[in-house]
């Protein structure tokens, strides 16, 4: 049984803040594993010294169960479903308030209806069980796809503000980001991480003595910067960890590289224009099958021109391009990828010729787990 503990000492400043808290709002809560929610509930009961849900604090969770669920690494359909807060004992304590007006697509009703059908799993399928995406433009040309979202490449460095190309896998994100960054003006500066074995690794002494730094350097983990972080001045990136909530420097914050120093990055916040510095921080990675725990000290940013479907969840974009050459494999992925924009004119699907019908409409897989819908 999985158990996550949230250890906040009763005498700490954070506990004191929570003692006087009357409202907590948790956005995109449907992406959160139920064990995280239960850990928060447990610590709030302890701090408030009461046995009522969330210590009696009004708790508002915002999210959409039709979108991407919690990530369960190598999880089965059943494991993913059971990880949802909908299957937590706390679920019975919530009052459900439905939002029935499509705010994002309110000016394109046909597109809003298509998004709803995709999200609910009610879009008609063909004899192969695939959906046909009417209304949405398609291309099989990756250059056209890139220029749709970033039309000024290569003459002007593109802006990522309210724009993104979307793909399913981190490897493809890295590849497509590199393709775009290669044509940006300026020279690359490569910043190397410091990788070392965590002493709590469950491996033999022989393996500890013979494992090499080069082995560590080759390891790539989702949402962890690579050993070789290649940056250019003017390049737009996003932060991958919460660094300073007070300053608005959070996970997914979009930034522009102003200058690179040996131990600091000089960045500009794309939303508010503020300039700030960030240091390297330590990331912990676990290779479960090998019992290896790795610490990587690296700057917490990644190139931001291309993102995964998962990372785009919650964002409203002016223009986007979902890559459907590889088909969706989990609940809510297609709904998230298509629904980031306001109108059908703001999205262009990249696909392959064999995934188009005679009218050039995309044919693809839409995965919806009925158990997760309200």
Task: Report each predicted region and the residues it spans.
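RecA-like helicase/translocase P-loop NTPase motor core
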Residues: 1-374
């Amino acid at each position: 049984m999985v158990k996550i503990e949230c250890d906040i000492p009763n005498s700490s400043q954070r506990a004191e803040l929570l003692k006087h808290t009357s409202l907590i709002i948790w956005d995109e809560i449907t992406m959160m594993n139920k064990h995280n929610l239960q850990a928060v509930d447990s610590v709030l009961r302890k701090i408030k010294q009461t046995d009522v849900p969330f210590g009696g604090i009004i708790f508002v969770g915002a999210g959409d169960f039709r979108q991407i669920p919690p990530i369960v690494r190598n999880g089965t359909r059943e494991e993913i479903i059971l990880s949802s807060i909908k299957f937590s004992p706390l679920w019975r304590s919530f009052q459900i308030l439905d939002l029935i007006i499509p705010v994002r697509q309110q000016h394109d009703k046909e597109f809003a209806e298509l998004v709803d059908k995709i999200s609910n799993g009610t879009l008609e399928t063909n004899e192969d069980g695939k959906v046909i995406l009417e209304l949405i433009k398609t291309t099989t040309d990756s250059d056209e796809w890139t220029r749709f979202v970033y039309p000024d490449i290569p003459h002007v460095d593109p802006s990522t503000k309210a724009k993104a190309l979307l793909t399913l896998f981190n490897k493809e994100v890295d590849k497509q980001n590199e393709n775009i960054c290669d044509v940006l003006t300026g020279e690359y500066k490569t910043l190397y991480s410091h990788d070392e074995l965590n002493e709590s690794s469950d491996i033999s002494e022989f393996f500890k003595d013979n494992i090499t730094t080069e082995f560590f350097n080759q390891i790539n983990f989702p949402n962890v910067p690579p050993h070789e972080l290649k940056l250019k001045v003017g390049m737009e990136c996003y932060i991958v960890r919460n660094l300073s909530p007070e300053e608005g420097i959070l996970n997914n914050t979009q930034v522009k590289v102003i200058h690179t120093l040996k131990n600091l990055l000089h960045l500009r916040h794309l939303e508010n224009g503020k300039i700030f510095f960030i240091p390297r921080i330590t990331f912990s990675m676990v290779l479960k099958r090998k019992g290896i725990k790795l610490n990587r000290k690296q700057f917490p940013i990644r190139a931001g021109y291309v993102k995964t479907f998962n990372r785009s969840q919650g964002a409203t974009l002016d223009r986007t391009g979902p890559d459907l050459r590889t088909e969706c494999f989990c609940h809510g992925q297609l709904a998230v990828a298509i629904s980031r924009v306001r109108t059908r004119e703001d999205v262009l699907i990249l696909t392959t010729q064999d995934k188009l019908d005679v009218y050039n409409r995309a044919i693809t897989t839409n995965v919806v787990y009925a158990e997760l819908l309200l």
